Amino acid sequence: MRRYYSSEYRVDYKGRSTPSLRHIARSGRGALNRYRELAPYLRRGDRILDAGAGGGEVVYVLRQLGFDASGLEPDEQYARHAREALGVPVATGFVQDATFPAGSFDVVTMYHALEHVEDPCAILSRLRGWMADRGVLLVEVPNVEAACIAPGHRFHFAHFYNFSGDVLEALGRKAGFEPVQTTTSPDGGNLMSVFMAVAQPQPPRFDAANYRRVSAAVRGHTALNYYGSASPYTGPFSRLRTYVTDRRAAQGCETPKQVLDKLIHRSEINL
């Protein structure tokens, strides 16, 4: 598993060992959106760790916006790209192997990484140990109840776990966090939970109704239902629009930094 995620996963998923300028543009737009999601919880100078930092776009954007951000990324080539092409502190390694003193971070983010780990609770508990009391953890994962993807694509080959909102919140409580809010993306495909690191979280709550709801959602999401909805027909146009937007964002740029700086400038976020 470790060999796969340190050297093979990105090639399988993205088709290359380092991100293209177009992929950097997409990740950069995503990083700006993630900053907007984080902004209500941030204070100037916060120490932020992006666990599963990919090519370092989130770390770069946050540092440009005045935060003390760093990252941890298991893929050797992507972590090296972040350090060399973007000049940001992204260490190569797995959360389960890394060590930081208690209270090292005010904020930890984990975007589409928790579903890839063998023991999600152990990972969140480890992150909690590195965080300041009342620090903020933001986790984004695919939504197992999503109806916007084809039934045959619900369970990704590289995902160890799948999450509903209730399960994600219970997992956070078990690891030493108290849920602040959980939201679903507009298309229903992703869940985002914001947690606060606390000394004594409420005990996890397990509701049989959650099992029944998730089970019904998975069983009920048939090919007939999916192809009778708008998702399979609007999806290709959405992907084409995203592709064109990414190409335009990267147009005229020669380096990853130029792509991200252009996006930050156009975002009109106050630096």
List PLM regions with ranges.
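A short glycine-rich, Lys/Arg-flanked "PGG" loop and its adjoining helix->strand segment in the class I
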Residues: 121-136
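Short N-terminal helix/helix-N-cap motif within the alpha/beta-hydrolase-1
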Residues: 118-122, 149
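Conserved N-terminal segment of class I S-adenosyl-L-methionine
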Residues: 1-103, 107-111, 121, 204-271
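Core SAM-dependent methyltransferase catalytic element
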Residues: 175, 184-219
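Short, glycine-/aromatic-enriched active-site segment of Class I SAM-dependent methyltransferases
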Residues: 139-173
